[in-house]
Amino acid sequence: MSGRAPFIKPVLEYNEHGWGPCEELSVDVPYQPFCKSDRVGKISDWTAPPTERKFANKYVSSFGNSNQYAYFHEDDESTFHLVDTSGFKGFRPFQRGRFRGNTRNNPRTRGRTGRGGAVTGTGGNQPGVGVNERTKYGKGRDNRRQMGRRFGRNAPTRMRESSVVVRSDWVSIEEIDFPRLLKLSLPNVKEGQDVVTCGSLEYYDKTYDRINVKNERPLLKTDRIIHTLTTTDDPVIRRLSKTIGNIFATDEILATIMCCTRSNYSWDVVFDKVGNKIFLDKRDNAQFDLLTVNETALEPPLEEEGSINSPHSLAMEATLINHNFCQQVLRGGDQKKYQFEEPYTLEESGVDLVSIGYRYKQWDLGNNIILIARCKHNGVLQGPNGEVQFLSIRALNEWDSKASNSLEWRQKLDTQHGAVLASELRNNACKLARWTVESVLSGSDQLKLGYVSRVSTRDHLRHVILRTQQFKPQEFSTQINLSMDNAWGILRCLIDIVMKQPDGKYLLMKDPNKPMVRLYDVPENAFESSDEDDLSDDKLFLLSN
């Protein structure tokens, strides 16, 4: 027994006061740092080949990446070393194929897809930029700026000016925002009945239907005169106001009010209430008759005043184009004309007037509201069965496709005219909606649209006709999502508000910077001169009789 080693009983740690660890810690046991978010899948990695190069460190422990796990020795700093962890990326869950994007046309991935080409481009001094990603000037594209300009995220806010200066003595009556107006509806409004028809119309020249980009035709200037009479200046409306109706307006004014929810620019309409009658009129020397250009575009014209691409210059250009186009496409001269029942009241001997026919129509809007409106046609067309079809002729104009961020007509109009029309519906939604409402109110059988472009982007005086297109107004209103029930509801709502007010003059104005309309009570002489005072006296005389 003396030759054997003695048996020494081991010392067992025993906690007599609880179930936890002993009070005396084992300071000599090595400690392995860990993080509870680490993956515990290392034991199965040997079953798959090591092909994950992009996420090679997906199982690496992320312990110590944050400063909260850092160890600082305060007593002995001789063995302390700083470890640079700036190059280590935080742990991200591995997801195969996420955010892969379009690799078919990407020159950076052609080397991996087997489509040819290198993995990295060789454009200038910037490695890794493909040839297709660079412009012709050798500068790489800034995709973030492109996206910002495209969707208007970084576009500067521009405060638009009001169509009329609001004075301090004007009383605000009502403010209606567009969401409320869009909920209005007045269904089952019957077709308007003709009360008086006057004027003469020329026949449409069908050769303009065969015009295309390769067979363009220059736009000619016309010297024919057109009278733009307001509601109270129209002698026929003055005559009708004695007997029938209590609401009087023109188709341009009605279309502006009915399509107000699509407008961005400011405009105003005057309501003259005398007794139980209301005259919807426009101010003299106002820009009400000018056609807007790219009003609803993401990037409307922002050029300085005096430039050919300023909003006012483009509006003047578009108005002249429409005036010349609607007369050029007609067979003038000594050709046969379509005559209405009465001649035009302002016809003078030796004066060449434009081809235009007026229909004074009557609508019953309910609640004893009878609307009398002057509508117009621009021409007539011989139908396939010999019937006469009335036309509303309008023209869209192209001024600079690059500046307006739209399609170039000379390249897309013949092959993709639907895409061109969709672009115009996006940039000129309000103008096209007004034209459609005017065509529906007048009862036109067709809406003729012409595509007129500048000869040069820097020349706003010479234009060419590239194409014509025709639509049925009712079908076209459905295509552009224009609800006539909502349009009638907006008009009826504003009429009811003015009907409840005392006699006087009221101004309906579109807010220049907010989607709402405002109704003001203005003085009688707010917009009138001495001649207009005489006109107001004549109107009161007519109503008294």
From Swiss-Prot:
Residues 95-113 have a biased composition (Basic residues). Keywords: Cytoplasm, Initiation factor, Protein biosynthesis, RNA-binding. It is found in: Cytoplasm. One of its GO terms (biological process) is cap-dependent translational initiation. Residues 94-148 are annotated as: Disordered. Residues 133-145 have a biased composition (Basic and acidic residues). HAMAP family: eIF3d. This is Eukaryotic translation initiation factor 3 subunit D-2. It comes from Drosophila pseudoobscura pseudoobscura (Fruit fly).
